[in-house]
């Protein structure tokens, strides 16, 4: 996918850079593979704001994407690649030989007409194929990696992301994540071959505030420009620096403060993403 820039006929067009989606399917999604999605606007069931700076945006239909890939040893053909408003990656519509259809995350270099297969045994190392980590060659680039067998892929699902399988140890696979973290995952967990599509997503420039509003994002207001009643950094005469270490609106430390508390899974992290890069 290439990037697309525009003639500056308006001030916002001057900065606008988007992903050229000309090669994607332009019709509606398969109705049987969609669900309704109501906009929450950052509110909970009491109507109170639980996530700030959300609301509005275009109505969306949720596409049911198969992250589990547990339809083993049934070959599928990629019908088309589609845009999905609910995620940064593209999705692929797959029709299996038994007639069933499913959406999967589209990896890079997957095109309409390609064959994909998922198995609990070793299969070809081709983009879109899925198999347990214990059968994937060391050094492979993978995505949509499970953390628990059967739970469905959780790691590397965003546009352009991938994980590298760097080794094996006592039934566990050693993975290197984009963040630099190295962690252990059980060898029976499934993973798909290749990196996730739409790697140019990180290079887009919205060009105007309205594009964020179309996505349901409202202006993100800094604490230092608020009043003291609204934020610990608020108030003061003229511009201030906040006068204290950065905190959330509720007074908890933020900006670099470690928040991970799941000590039971610490043993699976071989190298923290916070360790100094060598």
UniProtKB/Swiss-Prot annotation:
InterPro entries: NA-bd_OB-fold, Rib_uL2_dom2, Ribosomal_uL2, Ribosomal_uL2_bac/org-type, Ribosomal_uL2_C, Ribosomal_uL2_CS, Ribosomal_uL2_dom3, Ribosomal_uL2_RNA-bd_dom. Residues 210-221 have a biased composition (Basic residues). GO terms for biological process: cytoplasmic translation. The keyword Ribonucleoprotein applies. This is Large ribosomal subunit protein uL2. GO terms for cellular component: large ribosomal subunit. The keyword Ribonucleoprotein applies. GO terms for molecular function: rRNA binding; structural constituent of ribosome; transferase activity. One of the primary rRNA binding proteins. Required for association of the 30S and 50S subunits to form the 70S ribosome, for tRNA binding and peptide bond formation. It has been suggested to have peptidyltransferase activity; this is somewhat controversial. Makes several contacts with the 16S rRNA in the 70S ribosome.
